[in-house]
UniProtKB/Swiss-Prot annotation:
Probable transcription factor involved in plant development. InterPro entries: TF_GRAS (IPR005202). Belongs to the GRAS family. It comes from Arabidopsis thaliana. Keywords: Nucleus, Transcription, Transcription regulation. This is Scarecrow-like protein 33. PROSITE patterns: GRAS (PS50985).
Length: 694
């Protein structure tokens, strides 16, 4: 889409395992020595125990609410990552200078220091300056920023944001035919002229439309047909125009702040009005989870079960047609590919069932690959001006029906708190590769506020890729400002270090490590965007792992997307990514209605963009490169890390949480090779594990 999540006080307090240190673990397998990881010295009181699901949602909803209430949120950059932004900026700059873009660029970053007084102000107007030292309740706040000192711009020929894919039964033999027969060659060659001035003019027109008087002519029908009717190209244009019109404001301007406040109050009051949340340990669950091993060994490519939302109708096997089309595209058989795309278009829609939506986005990607414009389309999708508030709402919908990210965050935060408590840490330094909007950390901040004894200082080093424009670190700095405000509410001493540059170019001194602090390195599903040895002589993945090994962290917790669609061969990769996203679209179709606008936005901004990159891009432009959890396990061991076995009680409680809050027959939680695995209907999607340096 990057980059959403939710969580808090005592959100993990119920993970109190008196038998943790007895050394008995799962499946009678030989285990690693974990003598260096003692049980918690500071068990949390029973009266603070609460349901992890409710507290996690409460904290993150509060954090998202705080983000949405900011006055200029609509104009702020979206932090859901665009892995090609830096590369596109560098290429355009080198081309403007008449030089060749180097494969391995290692520019030195610029280091600047910004006082938190410029970023965080109290309601009364006072600020917390980095040079001020106060009491423990108003401890020193500091803010550092490390960003890439390099101007940025668009690709010289970007695809317009309103670009519409079309497939017709009759196509010209030239590559431009992919846009439809009505496009001439000159028009296609000059269609990428949407300048900043034009964008500002469009924005001004949209703002002016807010003040137009209401009339029947302005009323539109938001319903979208589920089936194709009439000519495909006309239907697609009407669908796009309807979508664009529906985004315009009503004639009478209404401040969204009140609406958002009411929406979040209804959610938060429900959580706070309850007298005492029932501890998950006291709730009644089955003695054993549904299955001992929930991940089936079904053959690759087996179709997911039909979802409850699907309706009966005779349609061709879209997956088979997509694979056949991919084979035709791979050998440049344009005639066959065009015919198959035309047939697929007749039975696909972004508003249909899971299979139809899947086919819609894969057809777009195959069409872009056939035209040779995959990178431009992906860049345009990544650069689309979608407001952060809309993205957050879509993400909130996702985490409300899918436990993947919630479970990964609970697992990581609980592990950090347990080990930090065992070490009696006074300062916790979290180095987060891919911090995005920082949704993972409010729950941990809330936990720190409930911690016994003296207050613990929190340091966070937020690492992100640079954004386009003259302020490449603006997004990651904004994340630090929000986290600082959250720490201020709970009187947690806080220090933030922002880094916006290529991850493989980060040096040890950039992280500003200090003696005696508890260092935890974390990454939530973002290592998949690092290039590997197939496209770079020095693998950025191994380089980042070696950097983490040099840090000598007290704990390293990678959360990975476990996938096998990183093969260099197109058809093989296409099959794997098709099976992977078949599960994800089926999951959305089972848990959300087709008309849900947030579902449509999430699938378009995240799934659709990722599919476009995997299918239509190659070389360094293909940044969606997941590996299986066993491949990441081998990489970590080669880099000098030792894996820590999972807590049996923790895995059991997470299973029960998913089974009680979600559909137990579809969402899977299990473990293998000391990895906590999550999946859908037997297919592994995400994995998390704990490592320490040798």
């Amino acid at each position: 889409m990057g980059s959403y999540s939710a969580g808090f006080p005592g959100s993990l307090d119920w993970f109190d395992f008196p038998g943790l240190g007895n050394g008995s673990y799962l499946n009678d397998q030989p285990l690693l020595d974990i003598g260096s990881v003692p049980p918690p010295l500071d068990p949390y009181p029973q009266q603070n125990l609460a349901s992890a699901d409710a507290d996690f949602s409460d904290s993150v909803l509060k954090y998202i609410s705080q983000v949405l209430m900011e006055e200029d949120m609509e104009d702020k950059p979206c932090m859901f990552h665009d892995a090609l932004s830096l590369q596109a900026a560098e290429k355009s700059l080198y081309e403007a200078l008449g030089e060749k873009y180097p494969v391995d660029d290692s520019d030195q970053p610029l280091t600047t220091t910004t006082s938190l007084a410029q970023l965080v102000s109290s309601p009364g107007g006072s600020s917390y300056a980095s040079s001020t030292t106060t009491t423990s309740s108003d401890s020193q706040w500091s803010f550092d920023c490390l960003e890439n000192n390099r101007p940025s711009s668009w690709l010289q020929t970007p695809i317009p944001s309103n670009f519409i894919f079309q497939s017709t039964s009759t196509r010209a033999s030239s590559g431009n035919a992919v846009f439809g027969s009505s496009f001439s060659g000159d028009l296609v060659s000059n269609m990428f002229n949407d300048t900043d001035l034009a964008l500002q003019f469009k924005k001004g027109m949209e703002e002016a439309s807010k003040f137009l008087p209401k009339s029947s002519q302005l009323v539109i029908d938001n319903s979208v047909p589920n089936r194709l009717t009439g000519k495909k190209s006309h239907w697609r244009e009407e669908e796009h125009l309807t979508e664009e019109r529906s985004k315009k404001q009503s004639a009478i301007y209404v401040d969204e702040t009140d609406e958002l406040t009411d929406m979040f109050d209804n959610i938060l009051i429900f959580g706070e009005a309850k007298e005492q949340p029932v501890c998950i340990l006291n709730e009644s669950f089955p003695k054993e989870p549904a299955k001992a091993s929930t991940f089936s060994k079904s053959p690759k490519g087996e179709k997911p079960e039909a979802s409850g939302n699907s309706y009966t109708k005779e349609t061709p096997d879209l997956r088979t047609m997509l694979v056949s089309c991919a084979q035709a595209v791979s050998i440049n058989d344009r005639r066959t590919a065009d015919e198959l795309l035309s047939r697929i278009r007749q039975h696909s829609s972004s508003y249909g069932d899971g299979t139809e939506r899947l086919a819609h986005y894969f057809a777009n990607s195959l069409e872009a690959r056939l035209a040779g414009i995959g990178t431009q389309v992906y860049t345009a999708l990544s650069s689309k001006k979608t407001s952060t508030s809309d993205m957050l709402k879509a993400y909130q919908t996702y985490i409300s029906v899918c436990p993947f990210k919630k479970i990964a965050i609970i697992f990581a935060n609980h592990s950090i708190m347990r080990l930090a408590s065992s070490a009696n840490a006074k300062t916790i330094h979290i180095i987060d590769f891919g911090i995005s909007d920082g949704f993972q950390w409010p729950s941990l901040i809330h936990r720190l506020a409930w911690r016994r004894g003296s207050s613990c200082k929190l340091r966070i080093t937020g690492i992100e890729l640079p954004q386009r424009g003259f302020r490449p670190a603006e997004g990651v700095i904004e994340t630090g400002r929000r986290l600082a405000k959250y720490c201020q509410k709970f009187n947690i001493p806080f220090e933030y270090n922002a880094i916006a540059q290529k991850w493989e170019s980060i040096k040890l001194e950039d992280l500003k490590l200090k003696e005696g602090e508890f260092v935890a390195v974390n990454s939530l599903f973002r290592f998949r965007n690092l290039l590997d040895e197939t496209v770079a002589v020095h693998s950025p993945r191994d380089t980042v792992l070696k950097l983490i090994r040099k840090i000598k962290p007290d704990v390293f917790i990678p959360g990975i997307l476990s996938g096998s669609y990183n093969a260099p061969f197109f058809v093989t990769r296409f099959r794997e990514v098709l099976f992977h996203y078949s599960s994800l679209f089926d999951m959305c179709d089972t848990n959300l209605t087709r008309e849900d606008p947030m579902r449509v936005m999430f699938e378009k901004e995240f799934y659709g963009r990722e599919i476009m990159n995997v299918v239509a891009c190659e070389g360094t432009e293909r940044v969606e490169r997941p590996e299986s959890y066993k491949q990441w396990q081998a990489r970590a061991m080669r880099a000098g890390f030792r894996q820590i076995p999972l807590e049996k009680e923790l895995v059991q409680k997470l299973k029960l949480m998913v089974e009680s809050g979600y559909k137990p027959k579809e969402f899977d939680v299990d473990q293998d090779c000391h990895w906590l695995l999550q999946g859908w209907k037997g297919r592994i999607v995400y994995g998390s594990s704990i490592w320490v340096p040798l």
